[in-house]
Amino acid sequence: QMDVQSTNVALLDTISREEIVAEITGVADKYQEMQVQHAHVRFHEHKEKLRGTPLIQCQIRLRTNRGQLAGSGEGYGADHAFHVALDKLERNVLELKGINADEEYRGQLLRKLGEL
């Protein structure tokens, strides 16, 4: 199981630690060559509220063998904030995967051109 550190767990209202670990693992698995060494999920409550639900900021940071990746987002309730941050993190993971694939393709193309 992945090592996930959560800060301000008192703000977790409708989402559990197990769900957080499962969701982050799902995002990390989209890029097999990336091994996650550590994940940190941080929640911060703002004073603003909507119908009694506080505005929460969530930051997710992954330390991997490919460098650091992060995603952050705000939402009313920990669940909403976490999923906004998770979407941004997922986009960053897929972008990193695409950049590495482009570099690999470029190297293959240059080798082919060198052989001609």
Where are the regions that the model predicts?
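Polyanion-binding surfaces on beta-sheet-dominated domains and ring/shell assemblies
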Residues: 1-57, 61-116
